[in-house]
Amino acid sequence: MVTENSAVPDKSLLAQYLPANYTDAYSKEVSGRDETTPEELMQAIFTHPSPLAGALMKLRNILVKPFGLETGSLEKQVANRILCRSDREIVIGMNDKHLWFAVSLLCAPKNGGSQRITVTTIVKYNRALGKAYFFFVRPFHRLLVRRALEKL
């Protein structure tokens, strides 16, 4: 089961980028298989997005192109955007005209061989367009993160 929280996890590398205008965290406990690494999680979410995520990104790119915002596939947008990493976490970030965001992919071991996978997002608005943009994106963001974790 995927759970939602609005706080950055304790000791997350993402904490150094706070404060933010928006924060969410989704997590899921997984067990009965090899541990997932942050790199594997990044690959699963961004390199092989769901058909829905791919379709929404194509629509987003069409809608934002007139505003001069960065466009491209999820994979293209996160390539070479790793801000920091540890053996259990990767933080990916991107700054555009309208907003700055970072996503943490945290894979924390738990007792009994299980693992807590947490995807945390923080957003900072660079200007009013960022706030308006994220108002429309937020429901889809929440849906897509939840679905990505449910597939694990």
Identify the residue ranges that each predicted region occupies.
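Low-complexity, charge- and small-residue-enriched intrinsically disordered regions
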Residues: M1, G68-Q77, L143-L149
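Short C-terminal domain-edge/linker segments immediately following a structured domain
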Residues: M57-N61, T121-Y125, A148-L152
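Beta-strand/loop substructures that line and gate deep hydrophobic ligand-binding cavities in soluble
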Residues: K97-F135
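A conserved amphipathic terminal alpha-helix motif
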Residues: Y133-L152
